[in-house]
Amino acid sequence: MDSNTVSSFQVDCFLWHVRKRFADQEMGDAPFLDRLRRDQKSLRGRGSTLGLDIDTATRVGKQIVERILEDESDEALKMTIASVPATRYLTDMTLEEMSRDWFMLMPKQKVAGSLCIRMDQAIMGKNIILKANFSVIFDRLETLILLRALTDEGAIVGEISPLPSLPGHTDEDVKNAIGVLIGGLEWNDNTVRVSETIQRFAWRSSNENGGPPLPPKQKRKMARTIESEI
């Protein structure tokens, strides 16, 4: 096992612990708490994959961070912060929409790279909007936190989420996953729109109504793909 992989996991565990202590003081905002929950799932998945105990990794991660901070001057810290590009966190969904459990009558699921696509294929003839919470850097999607498909009534009928055991995805991965989700939902005569935020950073739809920029023939092909593979 690569030593950098192990030490990276150990540092991530300790930094998560610090963020959790901060949240326990009731000082974290909604995006902060949202990332905290998602990162906890990711760390559990990575720990299982690596065969490492999280508590032990956290203690070792603390030692690594302490050694770094001992050698870090205030001036070097300022320069480091100034050189790091700013990441923006964009939220379509409320915390309630993000955390709400949902159930499928006809569950369908597909794993595409490090993303999991889920949908309820019992849903027919509904108006559906895709909403997402994600981070952006250099005006491009950096990390998808969660994307969900909601009906006009607010019911959740589909989602795209990162797999905790397979961290890392590109904006192109997210775009492809959105196409698969839309194709599957439209197969059942649902009308699907995407939020303005998703259009701008993850989908770049040319349809002013928020629909996907796919010709009908390609939509049908994509729908058949999801029908056979999910």
Swiss-Prot record:
Subcellular location: Host nucleus; Host cytoplasm
Gene3D superfamilies in the record: Influenza virus non-structural protein, effector domain, S15/NS1, RNA-binding
Motif position, Nuclear export signal: 137-146
The entry's keywords: Eukaryotic host gene expression shutoff by virus, Host cytoplasm, Host gene expression shutoff by virus, Host mRNA suppression by virus, Host nucleus, Host-virus interaction, Inhibition of host innate immune response by virus, Inhibition of host interferon signaling pathway by virus, Inhibition of host PKR by virus, Inhibition of host pre-mRNA processing by virus, Inhibition of host RIG-I by virus, Inhibition of host RLR pathway by virus, Interferon antiviral system evasion, RNA-binding, Ubl conjugation, Viral immunoevasion
Region of interest: CPSF4-binding: 180-215
SUPFAM superfamilies, A to Z: Ns1 effector domain-like, S15/NS1 RNA-binding domain
Positions of short motif Nuclear localization signal: 34-38
Superkingdom as given in the UniProt entry: Viruses
Residue span of region RNA-binding and homodimerization: 1-73
GO function terms (MF aspect): protein serine/threonine kinase inhibitor activity; RNA binding
Coiled coil ranges: none
Start and end residues of each stretch annotated as PABPN1-binding: 223-230
Primary localisation category: host cell
HAMAP family found in the cross-reference section: INFV_NS1
Domain notes: The dsRNA-binding region is required for suppression of RNA silencing.
Subunit structure: Homodimer. Interacts with host TRIM25 (via coiled coil); this interaction specifically inhibits TRIM25 multimerization and TRIM25-mediated RIGI CARD ubiquitination. Interacts with human EIF2AK2/PKR, CPSF4, IVNS1ABP and PABPN1.
Entry's family note: Belongs to the influenza A viruses NS1 family.
The protein, known as: Non-structural protein 1
UniProt source species: Influenza A virus (strain A/Fowl plague virus/Rostock/8/1934 H7N1)
